[in-house]
């Protein structure tokens, strides 16, 4: 039998871009949620998140059907999840004064997302990596989207991972080869094949207009722990 315990947690007023010291400086927080967003830890514990909830290394963040979420990381990076998507924070580390400790390692498990890279992506590009079902994505300071159409089908498209770049560039690599993708270009990565350029697959990420508004610092975050 599954039980749910809800709690209200104080969320500190954090100056994310300032590289605040302490545990929160190496994580991120929920900026916006429309629908349902959960975070599952490695031990199986699941939390239902709300704006200002903290996210941590090891969390798998998942949106349900008809749900969107935006996560702000302490280095200034921003991740927007579309409905029915899962995204894991494999290892994130950032302290403004210690770039040698930078790390931004994540994985797209299902669905899709858009990411705007932050300070880790601009000053420590070799320490930024996003895993997908068919390749690993590295960046050169950028804004890009990634969609997994293997775990969940995308209407009218081949089963593959699709990537689109808005700004900057990325490099997608697997055991069969690699491909650089510049702004305005799109990529398809099928299982057992090298990454290659493709036409626009038409996979948009369109969060609610409310996501365009800044989130006020401080306040409270309401969370439910599902057991």
Predicted regions and their residues:
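Bacterial N-terminal signal peptides
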Residues: 9-19
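Bacterial N-terminal signal peptides that target proteins for export
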Residues: 1-10
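Intrinsically disordered/low-complexity terminal segments and short unstructured peptides
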Residues: 2-3, 19-20, 62
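Flexible, surface-exposed loop/linker segments and immediately adjacent secondary-structure boundaries
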Residues: 24-60, 64-69, 73-227
């Amino acid at each position: 039998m599954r039980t749910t315990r809800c709690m209200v947690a104080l969320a500190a007023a954090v100056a994310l871009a300032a590289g605040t010291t302490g545990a929160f400086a190496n994580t991120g927080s929920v900026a916006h949620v429309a629908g349902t967003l959960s975070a599952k830890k490695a031990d199986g514990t699941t939390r239902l998140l709300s704006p200002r909830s903290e996210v941590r290394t090891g969390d798998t963040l998942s949106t349900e059907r008809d749900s969107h979420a935006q996560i702000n990381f302490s280095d200034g990076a921003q991740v927007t999840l579309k409905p029915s998507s899962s995204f894991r924070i494999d290892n994130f580390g950032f302290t403004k004064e210690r770039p040698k400790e930078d790390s931004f390692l994540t994985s797209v498990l299902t669905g899709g997302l858009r990411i705007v890279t932050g300070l880790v992506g601009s000053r420590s590009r070799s320490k930024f990596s996003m895993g997908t079902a068919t390749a690993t994505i590295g960046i050169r300071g950028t804004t890009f989207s990634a969609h997994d159409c293997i775990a969940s089908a995308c209407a009218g498209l081949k089963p593959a991972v699709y990537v689109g770049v808005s700004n900057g560039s990325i490099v997608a690599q697997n055991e069969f080869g690699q491909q650089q993708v510049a702004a305005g270009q799109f990529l398809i990565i099928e299982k057992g094949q090298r990454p290659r350029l493709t036409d626009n697959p038409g996979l948009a990420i369109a969060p609610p207009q409310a996501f365009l508004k800044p989130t006020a610092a401080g306040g409270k975050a309401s969370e439910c722990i599902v057991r």
